[in-house]
Amino acid sequence: MNLHEYQGKQIFAKYKLPVSQGIACKTADEAVEAIKQLKGDAWAIKCQVHAGGRGKAGGVKLVRNEAEVREFADKWLGKRLVTFQTDANGQPVNTLYVEETAGIARELYLGAVIDRSSQKVVFMASSAGGMNIEEVAAKTPELLHKVAIDPLVGGMAYQGRELAFKLGLTGDQIKQFSFIFTQLAKLFVEKDLSLLEINPLVVTTEGNLLCLDAKMVVDGNALYRQPELAAMHDPSQDDPREALAESHQLNYVALDGNIGCMVNGAGLAMGTMDIVKLHGGFPANFLDVGGGATKERVAEAFKIILSDKAVKAVLVNIFGGIVRCDLIADGIIAAVNEVGVNVPVVVRLEGNNAELGREILAKSGLNIIAAATLTDAAVEAVKAAGGK
């Protein structure tokens, strides 16, 4: 689950991390009132969306008076911001964050992720702050420094000092950075995060460190023990189809293609998407109905796929292990009868009750293309969607 920048900074403040004073605003009037409460003669006003690249897309601006604040608020509130990390529709802007500014001498990067191979939290720091960190890693890997956190002892001050030296920090900045590092390591574990980024972490013209941004992603599997963070969830940033799928215990991710995919098992779902791409097609989604799929859940999955108007064909690929293929067949028929289908449906059933499932579909009178193998299914789906 993603958090907004202003929410992340609220949490940072509780961990005594250096952040600018700021106010989250829902209306233009609130934004105008905010600059009256904040210090300084210039302020940063930022669109709050779950995506990076806001600055380049015009979603961040330095403002100096009430007129500029109101102009920015009127331009963005209730609109959608499109960045390189969003789809063509962008993300809705319902909140603006107005904060005090500071003179910037240097921009650094500091972030943390879970490294599955080492089974540890790994912190990354770079002197190339304010840039896309993936680009830094690809083009100038020597500027990216890493340190792994021992889960038994947590982040240690000496690790922070080592990173500070590599970043070229001096004097009291080293002490400041070490404190920020150890507090972030503590925060990462205590809040069950899967990703944490400060980009940029700046050195101000006064020589102090300041967290100018805050990106936090909470492990969705841990939300049951993070009620404070769960309450921060902003459903307006979610794809409505993904939210609906979650309510039916379906794993769904919307994509940009035109071949809807319904599969049981995440691995098989990814393999199905790969083979569709291999044969020249473009998946419209990732959808895993799970091992305990019921007739009702399959019907809902089918309806969610068909709600995407870009879908030109549907590929159903089921390997019956725990889930029974005849239940899948019943669910497909129920969904087709309820929603109505005007696109070709390609079905490949294998495993538990596969023969019965195929028989049910054959007797249904529906226009379904049966496939014996996964390759055949992918080829037929691409052809049905208008591909080669």
Curated annotation (Swiss-Prot):
Binding of ATP, residues: 46, 53-55, 99, 102, 107
GO cellular component, one term: succinate-CoA ligase complex
Signal sequence extent: none
A Pfam family annotated for this UniProt entry: Ligase_CoA
Enzyme class: ligase
Alphabetical UniProt keywords: ATP-binding, Ligase, Magnesium, Metal-binding, Nucleotide-binding, Tricarboxylic acid cycle
Cofactor info, note text: Binds 1 Mg(2+) ion per subunit.
Substrates-to-products reaction catalysed: succinate + ATP + CoA = succinyl-CoA + ADP + phosphate; GTP + succinate + CoA = succinyl-CoA + GDP + phosphate
Superkingdom field: Bacteria
Binding annotation for Mg(2+): 199, 213
Cofactor(s), names only, from the UniProt record: Mg(2+)
A GO molecular-function annotation: ATP binding
Entry function: Succinyl-CoA synthetase functions in the citric acid cycle (TCA), coupling the hydrolysis of succinyl-CoA to the synthesis of either ATP or GTP and thus represents the only step of substrate-level phosphorylation in the TCA. The beta subunit provides nucleotide specificity of the enzyme and binds the substrate succinate, while the binding sites for coenzyme A and phosphate are found in the alpha subunit.
Similarity field: Belongs to the succinate/malate CoA ligase beta subunit family.
The protein's assembly and partners: Heterotetramer of two alpha and two beta subunits.
Protein name according to UniProt: Succinate--CoA ligase [ADP-forming] subunit beta
